[in-house]
Regions:
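Conserved ABC ATPase "signature" region
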Residues: 6-24
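Conserved ABC ATPase signature
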Residues: 29-33, 37-39
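Hydrophobic anchor residue at the start of the ABC signature
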Residues: 43
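Catalytic Walker B motif of ABC-type/P-loop ATPase nucleotide-binding domains
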Residues: 54-57
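Helix N-cap at the start of a conserved alpha-helix in ABC-type nucleotide-binding domains
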Residues: 65-67
Length: 135
């Protein structure tokens, strides 16, 4: 984390932990956190300095469904605020939260479509959009 004094850095860190639902766990050691909580700490670290581009590789893999919804809502909010968010996932219901779906196989692009036009993702889009609106 760069910029500002120690108190400013701590404040930004606390805000990032709050955004991922871990504000109450700030004094816990890594060994006291579950796998999903560690995943959320990693997400908090990634958003801490407000990057223009956020690349998240399977960001919801260790999360329960409720926390997955919260984190995808956070990513949607970051995107609405002007950040580019790139999600790597094997889950069609997670991909449905995205604007575009790029399918790869052995490093080659098979398709690049709006989520609504991707046959495997499109059935999940209405529910994903409804969850995003609620988040």
């Amino acid at each position: 984390m760069t910029g500002g004094g120690a108190s400013a850095r701590r404040k930004r860190a606390l805000e990032a932990l709050e955004q991922v639902g871990l504000g109450g766990r700030v004094d816990h050691r890594p060994s006291q956190l579950s796998g999903g909580q560690k995943q959320r700490v990693a997400i908090a670290r990634a958003i801490l300095n407000n990057p223009r581009i956020l690349m998240a590789d399977e960001p919801t893999g260790n999360l329960d469904s409720a926390t997955t919804t919260e984190i995808l809502g956070l990513f949607s909010a970051l995107h609405r605020a002007g950040q580019t968010v790139i999600l790597v996932t094997h889950e069609n219901d997670v991909a449905a939260h995205c604007q575009r779906v790029v399918r790869l196989f052995d490093g080659r692009i098979l398709s690049d479509l709006p989520a609504e036009q991707d046959d495997e993702v499109a059935p999940h889009v209405p529910a994903a959009r409804a969850m995003g609106a609620a988040a």
